[in-house]
């Protein structure tokens, strides 16, 4: 088959496909549409301001009211939806935003202005920076000789109670709760004729650092208020670790813990009153942790 025959065959096929119409058609030149860009001044809504307890993304749920009632009972991410095999964009963005807040809380420091405002006694463990704090938890439990002298010089020897504040794994937890919980503890202790004076602030703090403080000060009870590891629900959760005459290397069972102290958990004012009661009971029974009945 030569070129001429091939050309005739193609023309025949095209004629059959067009229903026998052989009139030439001229394709219209495409026209360019003009899209006008409108720039408006405004702000992008903050996705973290959405209350996920009230947000239901499931389309046409069988029991909408029951679903929302269940969501009020937990901060878990229930009632999400998907686009094919993946979560919707809004859900993914909220997840990443909450994760970023948690990361920021771990790697940031408690404001020095807050430490000065609260008249804390600032000390530092043997950790030099956040990286060392995260990779060497053993150094976050110990103080060097210089810090030991600072603690000794600014606290009352053999006091009934020594309050300690530590940044821990969440600076946001301290900044969000400390101003409310300390007055509540002090007020609650007045009922038992108890009080505390200078408060130690520990930078790069691990929980067992309270044990060395207990040995340095000789206090009957040491109460450590520390920022807990943040999660996707909140970065502002604080805990109180309380022990009667803590010593270095003591078993963890000797600590009494009140956790989940934040606005969405146990309110700091309520927690402060309970902490005061626990401190009184420890002094009365001379024990703490699982030994405190």
Curated annotation (Swiss-Prot):
Its EC number is 4.3.1.7. GO terms for biological process: amino acid metabolic process; ethanolamine catabolic process. Signal peptide: none annotated. It is found in: Bacterial microcompartment. It catalyses: ethanolamine = acetaldehyde + NH4(+). Its main location: other. It comes from the Bacteria. It is an enzyme of class 4 (lyase). Binds between the large and small subunits. Keywords: Bacterial microcompartment, Cobalamin, Cobalt, Lyase. HAMAP family: EutC. Catalyzes the deamination of various vicinal amino-alcohols to oxo compounds. Allows this organism to utilize ethanolamine as the sole source of nitrogen and carbon in the presence of external vitamin B12. The basic unit is a heterodimer which dimerizes to form tetramers. The heterotetramers trimerize; 6 large subunits form a core ring with 6 small subunits projecting outwards. Belongs to the EutC family. This is Ethanolamine ammonia-lyase small subunit.
């Amino acid at each position: 088959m030569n070129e001429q025959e091939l050309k005739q065959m193609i023309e025949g096929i095209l004629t059959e496909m067009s229903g026998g119409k052989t009139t030439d058609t001229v394709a219209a030149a495409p026209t360019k549409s003009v899209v006008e860009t409108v720039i408006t001044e405004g702000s992008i809504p903050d996705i973290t301001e959405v209350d996920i307890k009230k947000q239901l993304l499931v389309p046409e749920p069988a029991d909408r009211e029951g679903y929302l009632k269940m969501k009020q009972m937990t901060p878990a991410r229930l009632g999400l939806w998907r686009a094919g095999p993946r979560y919707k964009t809004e859900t993914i963005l909220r997840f990443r935003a909450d994760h970023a807040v948690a990361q920021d809380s771990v790697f940031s420091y408690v404001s020095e202005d807050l430490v000065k405002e609260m008249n804390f006694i600032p000390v530092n463990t043997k950790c030099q920076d956040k990286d060392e704090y995260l990779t060497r938890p053993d150094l976050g439990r110990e103080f060097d000789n210089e810090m030991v002298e600072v603690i000794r010089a600014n606290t009352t020897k053999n006091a009934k109670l020594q309050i300690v504040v530590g940044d821990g794994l969440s600076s946001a937890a301290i900044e969000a709760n400390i101003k409310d919980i300390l007055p509540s503890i002090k007020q609650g202790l007045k009922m038992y004729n108890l009080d505390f004076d200078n408060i130690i602030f520990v930078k790069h703090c691990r929980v067992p650092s309270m044990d060395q403080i207990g040995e340095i000060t000789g206090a009957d009870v040491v109460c450590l208020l520390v920022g807990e590891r943040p999660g996707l629900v909140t970065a502002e959760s604080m805990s109180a670790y309380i022990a009667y005459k803590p010593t270095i290397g003591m078993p963890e069972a000797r600590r009494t813990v009140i956790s989940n102290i934040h606005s969405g958990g146990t309110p700091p004012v309520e927690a402060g009153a309970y902490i005061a009661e626990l401190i009184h009971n420890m002094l009365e029974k001379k024990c703490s942790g699982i030994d405190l009945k």
